[in-house]
Amino acid sequence: MPVFFLYFSQRLSLSQVLRLEAIYYLCIVLVEVPSGYFSDRYGRRLTLLIASAALFVAYVIFFFGDNFGEFAVAQAFLAVGLAFNSGTDTSLHYDSLASLGRESEFGDREAIVARNSMLAGGLAAVIGGAVAVFELRYAYLLSAGMALVTLMVVLKIAEPESHKKTLLPEKPATQLKICLGLLRHPLLAWIFAFYVLITVLNHIPYEFYQPYLAMVLQKGTSLASGTPLSTGIHFGAAMFIASFFAAFSSRLCQRIGLKRLLLSLVAFQTLTILAMGLTLNFLIVVLVLFRTVPRALMTAPMNAAIAPLVGSSQRATFLSIQSLAGRLAFAGFLAGLSLVASESGQAQWSPLSTQLLISAGFGITGLFALSLFGKGK
């Protein structure tokens, strides 16, 4: 959704916008892990049905909403929708291949999934940005329509046979203990730490490129009606670029190694954030076009490394725990950044620059720690 920051900023102060984002991530805390257990216990199909329905409700509320309270409710439904999808989509993919005895194809197929997902996301961003030139809320109407289409598609999905045999996982407390115990595996623990760090770093350019782009194009003046199209095209271009890299992510990982690949992605994203924080320049806008490349290159190799190490009856729960840790880390980080945000409705360069430089410092520290943690393992 390339217009959410602009849409909220029309009606709320920057600090309120950041708090709305924090509310979303904190709501994830309530449903992320239970949604993973629900998927392991009741099946992938039902979980995805709930996810699609919740997203539809969220976008409808966004479309009709006009104040902080209504947007907060919509954020809660959005959290439910994305949490119930998180981990279950990957688990459904692996379980489906396992049912066919084709698990070895998972990594390469995940790369194709990532590529296609980003191509679709890029197209949606351009269309949403164009529609939002006339009215920002129309982008949410289109999103509601697509959520409804997704719901119809999920109704046609069958539960994988391999997962039907494991639909009775341990009791919730025991399941949680088993999943956390999996972190004794050195590779799973390292990937878990990487995921928490990169979740924070990947979201920083995504959250702040809209006001940054507006300042570059308009030298800090108020957001004009052309900005949604500009941000939509920019977001779409970023997704199209990322889709190119996603297509060969599995092969790149095989060539240079998983840890080396993932560490290089942390370094790249940190440098991007640092550049954004140092200056307002159109060349940085071009650099930020590559901000989604780390997610494109990490998704398939990371999932391919995790899936065989975690059993089907724990896989969605484990992935949900990992996702929760990353989202919770970003929620706390975002709440902290809101303390140095402007209280006015218009984003200003000085506090924005400070937020970005703080984020870059966090990335440098995390990269150093992750490099040390990964040595010899």
Where are these predicted regions, by residue range?
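Helix-loop junctions on the cytosolic side of multi-pass membrane transporters
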Residues: 136-139, 143-170, 371-377
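Juxtamembrane intracellular "pre-TM" segments in multi-pass secondary transporters
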Residues: 157-193
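Cytoplasmic helix-loop-helix junction between adjacent transmembrane helices
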Residues: 76-118
